[in-house]
Amino acid sequence: MSDKILWPGSWLFHLSFFFVIVRHLRYFLEPVPDCVTALQPFGVFAGYVLLLALASVLCMRLFSGKKRYVSYSNYFILSLILLISLSGILMRNFFRPNLLQVKAFSLGILTFSPETLPSGNLFIFHFLLALLLVPYIPSHIFAAPLVLLDAARREKGLGMMMHEK
């Protein structure tokens, strides 16, 4: 039963994550392409869907009988993205940073001429968590087949992988 709920939650997560990333491109591109501008409303909606999808995937991971498939690394990245998503929604609705400062700061980083860091502790928290996520995603993607092989090995009772001894 959990797989029937986990798969749609996972797809919703990945699709909404994509739209949120596309929405954030407006802070890193000047001029902003029309396709990015056209997708802005979807990105806003996707931010809320992302939070709900993350919560559902995390709950299914926590309460599913297939805990052997979930590593601490999975919990770490889910929690990290959940915190990034939550802080982003809080900034969108309650603690709005100055978006002109955010864009100037982002473009300054990309052009190696940094601007002043926008004020607001929540933005700094959100930004630092995103910086932590960026290098983690490629290693998470490349390690995914090994995690699945490890889970299958444990399911068959073949013991631990060599790195866990």
List PLM regions with ranges.
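Long, contiguous internal "core" modules enriched in hydrophobic/ aromatic residues
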Residues: 1-107, 115-125, 133-143, 147-160
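Terminal, Lys/Arg-rich, intrinsically disordered segments and adjacent short helical elements
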Residues: 163-165
